[in-house]
Amino acid sequence: MYCLGGLTFLFFVLLVITGMMLAMYYKPSAAGAYDSVQEISTVVRYGWLIRGVHFYAANGMLIAAILHMLRVYFTGAYKKPRELNWVVGVGLGTLTLMAGFTGYVLRWDQEAVGAQGIGLGLASSIPGLGTIVTSIFWGNYDETIGHFFVGHVLLIPAVLILLMVFHFWMIRSHGIAEPL
């Protein structure tokens, strides 16, 4: 019951390793993205395995993070003096969802193109920030997929790592909350 945070971190490490391998062959352009994903799956040696591990680790990380947050919430482990750690954890959960969305779009097939339109449409409805977020990601197809690629491969993981370090430091300084 108390290993869900560690399991989430293990999935993240797997995602970083397999993501670096996939990034060597992926082409973030509207013309080459789908073909490069097909090439990774069929031509690159063990590409199907690397892509599969990345896919299942992403799903595992999302499930483990949600279960971890539910456990923290229902056991009351977010209470004083751990409120800031809870806020950081919610930020980590939000970034995990963002990483999943940006990774889904990188396949650049019909589903991904439709999903990015819906996702950016939802993002544009955020009061105050919506137009800024949408203007950053939306452009022509090459710009859009490039922005999602940079977000998925560089920005989101960098912020995730920084918040994880802070999250772990807070756990070390406050200790693990006692069970009910």
Each PLM stretch: what is its role?
Residues 1-180:
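Membrane-embedded alpha-helical bundles that constitute the cytochrome b-like, heme-associated redox core
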